[in-house]
Amino acid sequence: MKNTLNVKMLYQFYHHAVKAELKKNGFSADIAKKINAEHRKIIERAKEIGKSKLLSSYIMTSYFIAMNRSTGKSAEENYILFRDGLCASKLFHKVIGDVEQYLDPKKMPGRLQWSADSHKRKYENDWVVDILPGTETYDLGYDYHVCGACKLCQDEGCPELAAYICRMDYVLAEIMHMKLVRTGTIAEGAPYCDFRYSRLSDAEHRKES
């Protein structure tokens, strides 16, 4: 895929957070350089997904693959480094926003259009999604029938790493003060990924604080 300005910005966004965590944990500066070099190679090989709404998730995946080829640590250890780096980043918290911004009803028309466009399957590695309006049990749902993270990991010969990107979804939901319920993912062998997002109850808010 082309190393566009958006791709570079997303890479730097993740790299800045992870570099701080690597330094905190005593890694040499050479590790960050190795990640950078490896990530460039992955991007050169990666299939295009156009102006996908989930480009950030695609680059999160490419970055995580690069980490696993550079740090000498296990996938679990790299996941923890990545997770903790993002959680410690004030910029990351600011960029992803909060529950009210995420669940703003004004965003629904755009989401429905995204869903319709995704089913055209213009790009092999892009996500294909159905958007589910809220019900009595959740506020917003997604059913993903194709996962770009799984596709990229498969292309790179490391399908086992996709499950760690799935785990990051819970981290993002927690940062936004939302509850995510999911019964299966494509990475785990399910036919689709069923995301159900909800606002936290008063009791859950108290527990979180």
PLM region descriptions:
Residues 1-69:
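N-terminal, charged low-complexity regulatory/assembly segments
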Residues 7, 157-158, 208:
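A generic structural signal for short
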Residues 30-34, 75-88, 182-187:
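Short alpha-helical "patches" and their helix-cap loops
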Residues 51-55, 59, 153, 157, ...:
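Conserved aromatic-histidine-acidic binding/catalytic patches
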Residues 59-65, 69-156:
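Amphipathic interaction/junction segments at domain boundaries or subunit interfaces
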Residues 130, 155-170:
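Conserved helix-adjacent loop modules within structured domains
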Residues 163-209:
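C-terminal structured interaction module
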